[in-house]
Structure formats: C-alpha cells, structure tokens
C-alpha cells in the first residue's frame, strides 16, 4: 500500500480498498526518535526516560545496515538458515525483469532500497543434522573437504527441500531424478550442500547484474555464514569475485549503529560503515580460485537445475 518511489501511502491502491491515507499513522523512518521508554519499562529496568529510536525495521534490514561496504560496486549476502542476496540502491528497481527474476524492493536506511532475493541457506544442513551421528560444524566441514568435488549438485531452492520429512532422502531423490549419484556419506551430503549453495549464489549474482545500474565487484557476507570458511571460499570460486566477510552479529551492530547515528556519534551511513570496518578484527577476504573448474561445475549445475 506504499508507493516505493514516493515512500508515501499509495492513494490509488488505498482507494481500491475503500481507505484513505488519513486512516493510517505517520510512517517512521530508520534513525528517527519514536519516543521514550514507557513508565512501566522505566520502573522495571531503572533506566529512566531513555530515548527509543527506530532502526532498520527488522533483522535483515539492520544486518544490511552493518555491511562494511566501501562503495556501491558491492552486493551483500546475509547468510544463515536462509540466504538473502542483494544490492543497496538509491531507487527501487521495478521492471518486468525484476518481476520475472522475483526480486523484492525493501526500504533501507537513509532512503536506500534493498533490492534482494531470498535463497535457501543452512536450512538444508540443519535439517540433515538430526539424521546423522552428533557432529560439530568443524567435523562436518572436515568430512566434506575429503570428498570428491561436484559429485552431486542440487537446486537449493527446489520445492522438495522446503520441509521434507527427511532432508537426506529428499536430496537423494533429487540426485537420482537428475541422473546423478546420490550422496552416501555425511561428507558427501555436506559437500553437495555447500557447492550447490555457492553455485546458486552465482546464479543470483548474475541475475543481480541484469538489474544493477553499476558493476558488482565484490560480495560481502554477514551473519552466521560469515564464519563458514569452506562455504565462503566456494562462493568466491563460484561467483568469480572476492568475498569479504563482515560480522556474524551484523543485526545487533546495525541496530546499535542506527541509534548511534541518531545520537550524533556518526553523521552518515558512510561514517557508520567506516566505523564498523575499523572495528572488525576478524574480517576475511576470499579470492576466487580454480575458475575453469568452477565454470564447468556451473554448467553441470544448470544442467541439473530443476524446480521439482
């Protein structure tokens, strides 16, 4: 019901619903003061009349606010149970192509638009883990590194992986249906998941390049996936540009930094991100490797890509 270009209530759509803009409250933008803590919260916490500031609307919005980008020639990947990949734009990108590719336009900070696509993520692995002997992430990754590369590939966003009774069986069935050997060992499953996610990321980066008004020269990874070194290297290899990691706690950082901006600690989003970059002591950069091998793998991925 909001016009993405004017950022105001869309009178035409409201009229179709028999409503008027006056029926709704004033929209609050990120970085604006909403008020102060209620008297009840003040009493319970002893904090007093602390100002309450609007942040970037929800977890992903706050996480993207904390992406340590240096310029607009970057894409971001919020990597966790789900993956959200996109770019930050000054204007919404609304076209037949963006509709066809199923990208959304979501409000960001300082009037920006988050043009993004939802992708599957660690959901695949999380649903497999209960079916295996108890293993930590380090053990899972070590087992994957020992296995043959690109033995089995899947479309992580295929409908059959949305909520199957058994994720391992769903992966096996997909592989059989596409003429591939099904994973048998834990390491083969993990490698299949990581390589397939990385190749799906390449597919989405190529979609973004069709929509983006500027070149995409690097990908920033934030969220829990920023700590997954194997997946990040696979991603750099697949997309052919450097992958740079931000914080695994980007949602909390973005939330706090918008409050800091309201308080005058920083004046702009560029200052905010410069402060975040200077504070990161665990950021890593992954350069693309084995480009020809991964180009061949991408062709195989496309050949077995099915919606199922």
PLM feature spans:
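Active-site core segments that coordinate phosphate-bearing ligands/cofactors
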Residues: 3-11, 15-16, 39-218, 227-251, ...
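Short beta-strand to alpha-helix junction loop
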Residues: 5-6, 30-34
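A conserved helix-loop-beta module that forms one wall/lid of the active-site cleft
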Residues: 14-31
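Small/polar loops that bind or transfer phosphate-bearing groups
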Residues: 29, 223, 247
């Amino acid at each position: 019901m909001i016009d993405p270009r004017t950022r105001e209530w869309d009178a035409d759509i409201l009229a179709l619903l028999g409503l008027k803009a006056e029926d709704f409250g004033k929209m609050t933008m990120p970085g604006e003061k909403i008020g102060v803590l209620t008297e009840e919260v003040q009493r319970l916490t002893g904090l007093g009349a602390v100002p309450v500031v609007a942040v970037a609307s929800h977890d992903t919005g706050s996480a993207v606010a904390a992406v340590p980008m240096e310029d607009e020639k970057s894409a971001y990947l919020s990597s966790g149970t789900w993956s959200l990949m996109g770019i930050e734009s000054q204007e919404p990108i609304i076209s037949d192509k963006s509709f066809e590719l199923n990208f959304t336009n979501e409000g960001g900070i300082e009037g920006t638009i988050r043009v993004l696509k939802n992708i599957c993520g660690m959901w695949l692995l999380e649903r497999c883990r209960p079916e295996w002997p108890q293993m930590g992430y380090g053990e899972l990754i070590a087992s994957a590194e020992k296995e043959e590369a690109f033995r089995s590939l899947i479309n992580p966003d295929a409908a059959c992986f949305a909520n199957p009774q058994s994720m391992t069986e769903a992966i096996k069935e997909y592989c059989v249906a596409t003429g591939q050997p099904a994973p048998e060992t834990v390491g083969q499953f993990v490698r299949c998941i990581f390589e397939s996610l990385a190749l799906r990321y390449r597919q989405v980066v190529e979609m973004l390049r069709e929509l983006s008004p500027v070149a995409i020269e690097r990908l920033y990874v934030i969220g829990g996936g920023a700590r997954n070194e194997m997946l990040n290297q696979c991603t750099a290899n697949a997309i052919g540009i450097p992958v740079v990691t931000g914080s695994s706690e980007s949602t909390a950082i973005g939330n706090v930094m918008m409050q800091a901006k309201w308080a005058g600690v920083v004046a702009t989003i560029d200052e905010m991100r410069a402060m975040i970059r200077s504070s990161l002591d665990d950021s890593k950069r992954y350069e693309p490797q084995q480009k020809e091998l991964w180009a061949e793998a991408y062709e195989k991925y496309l050949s077995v890509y099915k919606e199922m």
